[in-house]
Amino acid sequence: GRPEFTDPLPLGGGYLAALLGGRFVVVDVRRARARILYEDYLKMLGNGSSVSQQLLFPERLVLSGDEYALLEENAVEFASLGFDIDFAGEGTIEVKGTPADMPADAVDQMVYDLLQAFSTPVSLADQRREKIAAVMARGGAKGIPRNMSRDEAAALLSQLAATGNFSFSPSGKAITAEITPEDIRTKLG
């Protein structure tokens, strides 16, 4: 079977330590979250079922004519990601709901980044899906991890292990780093 994370220990500063198949590793919490969300969004884009959270104050955005048209064309996919959007005309949209794990202050940036991803031709469906999932994961992982409890750390690590890829974040950055006895010897001199 695949190696399991055990003995999680939150380190603060957005990191946690754990054993991975007997090796001592440090995990970047934000990148781990991005990997988990990325896999979740890829699945969602496949079957279109995301949870939307209603915003207390809808966010009004003014788009260019092209962006507005692109958004209208892809309205169904935006909805499947968990966006609740009203088209007010004149290039104005009102975002009334966002995906459940999206920080509210990331909404406008998210919409613009997603429009970039959606401008990938539909003929490149897989690439397009991956780009969209990567944008969503980046947005969702933005919230700075506060200090985690041991249980939260354990839950995050088991979700990470379930993705089958705990080496790299969607943007290709390392999620885990092994700390070897040599590293420790060097540090302690």
Model segments located where?
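Long, charged low-complexity intrinsically disordered regions
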Residues: 2-189
